[in-house]
Amino acid sequence: MAHDQLHRYLFENYAVRGELVTVNETYQRILTNHDYPAAVQTLLGEMLVATSLLTATLKFSGDITVQLQGDGPLKLAVINGNHLQQMRGVARLQGDIAPGSSLKEMVGNGYLVITITPTDGERYQGVVGLEGETVAECLESYFQQSEQLPTRLFIRTGQHEGNPVAAGMLLQVLPAQDAERNDFDHLAQLTATVKAEELFTLPANEVLYRLYHQEEVTVYEPQDVEFQCHCSRDRCANALMTLSDQEINEMIEQDGEIDMHCDYCGTHYLFNSLDIRAIRHDSSGNLLH
């Protein structure tokens, strides 16, 4: 099975572009060190595929966060990705989730938040109600409301050789182009026939040929997708310095050290009294980076 990659492609005879992504290794890394219920694992896979596809639509350096939150047993699920296709994600539960639970059963009364943060420029946030039955349907509504670009997402998750796998495709009318709705619907119907097993096991070019062998398609150089966490000891130290001396001293007196745990990658950062003394000395100048 090939490593995780995103492939962009363009239909020469239609004002429509597409993306195909596989995120198997990244998906498995996100699930490592977490004992999520099966339905939550599936949901995170869908969100990971969707975030990768959305991030690839960015025309600038920056990142996208796709977040689900509500009052159901799934309190929060979030995937963060950037223009380099570096992904991470986590979920937080506040109740039991049965196998096969639907999106609405997990989230309850909630919403989907898409946050776009350019490296240079203003942050943008869009909020979408959970009107669709799936993450893909909710995001299609987001595109229709925010960008008014006909967009379809085709997301597949499952198991292959005992491991969780996820992949998907995106079709979108090119901005400032007048694509015939019938043309877009025709391509969407072709894309909807893609089988999960094809996405999980076949090279991207073969999948695209099977779907569009009667169309003229240009496929661009692929981009690697990988799990990447941005936590660090210095970031944890900076966070500690936002606490009062009394709070820090009480934590050290109680446990002998402070254990800061990254929910995304599972790394533990330990700080004892000597570490705190050194951090306080450093923080008297500039914050750590």
Curated annotation (Swiss-Prot):
Disulfide bridge partners, by residue number: 229-231, 262-265
KW NAD (keyword) present: no
A GO term, aspect molecular function: unfolded protein binding
InterPro entries found in the cross-reference section: Heat_shock_Hsp33 (IPR000397), Heat_shock_Hsp33_C (IPR016154), Heat_shock_Hsp33_N (IPR016153), Hsp33_helix_hairpin_bin_dom_sf (IPR023212)
Keywords: Chaperone, Cytoplasm, Disulfide bond, Redox-active center, Zinc
Alphabetical GO biological process terms: protein refolding
Annotated transmembrane regions: none
Signal peptide: none
CDD domains on file: Hsp33 (cd00498)
UniProt-recorded name of the protein: 33 kDa chaperonin
Natural source organism: Pectobacterium atrosepticum (strain SCRI 1043 / ATCC BAA-672) (Erwinia carotovora subsp. atroseptica)
